[in-house]
Amino acid sequence: MSRLNLTMEVLLVAFVAVFLTSQVHSDEIPYEHLMSQLQACPKECNCPPNFPNAVYCDNKGLKSIPVIPPYTWYLYLQNNLIDVLSANALRNATQLKWINLNRNKITTEGLEVDALRAMSNLVHLYMEDNLLSSIPSPLPAKLEQLRLSRNKISKIPPGVFSGMGHLTLLDLQSNKLQDDAVTEVSLKGLNNLIQINLAKNQLNSMPLGLPPTTTQIFLDGNNIEKIPAEYFKGLPKVASLRLNRNKLANGGIPKNVFNLSSILDLQLSHNQLTEVPVISSGLEHLHLDHNKIKSVNSSDICPPGVLDDHLEEKSPRLRYLRLDGNEIQPPIPRELMTCFRLLRAVVI
């Protein structure tokens, strides 16, 4: 062995020894695996010894995925020119937990069938800003977060979420989904979903088939005109609802559709409302800015009996109210402040 090679070997061993005692992961990686990982690092990428399970291949101008070391947990491939996701490149990466493929050129046709399924331990998949026309299938069964915003997705294949009971977050913002794509059939299998983002699609109606576990629903920037009276009957846990920038008018909102004990955050900005809808006493944040509201009638918005009851524990929970961008003139009605005693901010 040459003196140079010997020196490099000694330095590598010393470097590894230093960082073995200061790993960022709670799960210890065996020494021999760490050595193998560092030595197998693709020449196009960066594998920092202090983050031994991570491989950084972002911003490298890559057109294909290099062969990834077997003990990789976190793989960063964003901001490249990758147009094919091959099973061969990831055949050794069976321990992957997190892969970031944002801002590439991957198409549905360029996604090989078994490329994702082989990653049986994957929990986070980022494929935002690509050229996908359909949701990738089959997906890893342990996946918890799937982020596919800003693609060209127009369809959700039936059964694509079958067996996806671990998925809690589904981000499909800024795609081309229409009403017939989001149904009970297409979403079947999402038994533990918490957040769904369907903002900036081409929906004309409220999406069907959302699981009862859903707590956050983002529907901003669609063409929704009405909400069915019983829509939230099957969604008992919804806490945050965003319907900004739709086409909602008073006629499209049944009187008590938002009078839900679970809802904490309701956003209806940039619609066509002329009146404040009925809200629940548990609501904490209400966004009604940039509508066509001319006045706020406290007797309509205030829950029954509140103005006559001075008990603090029975006060409505509203803390933040936006009414700017309407036709309302200051000052804020006194009855409004009397009703919502916990209000901390009113924008008018």
Curated annotation (Swiss-Prot):
Post-translational modification: Glycosylated. Contains keratan sulfate chains.
Residues carrying covalently attached carbohydrate according to the record: N92, N259, N297
Top-level division of the source organism's lineage: Eukaryota
Entry's Gene Ontology cellular component terms: extracellular space
Signal peptide range: 1-26
Cell location: Secreted, Extracellular space, Extracellular matrix
LRR repeat intervals: 70-92, 93-118, 119-140, 141-163, 165-189, 190-213, 215-234, 235-260, 262-280, 281-303
Keyword Heme annotated: no
Keywords: Disulfide bond, Extracellular matrix, Glycoprotein, Leucine-rich repeat, Repeat, Secreted, Sensory transduction, Signal, Vision
Tissue expression summary: Expressed in eye, where it is found in the corneal epithelial layer and to a lesser extent in the stromal layer (at protein level).
GO biological processes: visual perception
Disulfide-bonded cysteines: C41-C47, C45-C57, C302-C339
Phenotype on disruption: Morpolino knockdown of the protein results in increased apoptosis in eye, forebrain and midbrain, and reduced survival rate in embryos.
Transmembrane intervals: none
Domain LRRNT: 40-69
Family of this protein: Belongs to the small leucine-rich proteoglycan (SLRP) family. SLRP class II subfamily.
Its job: May be important in developing and maintaining corneal transparency and for the structure of the stromal matrix.
PANTHER family xrefs: AGAP008170-PA, KERATOCAN
Protein name per UniProt: Keratocan
Source species: Danio rerio
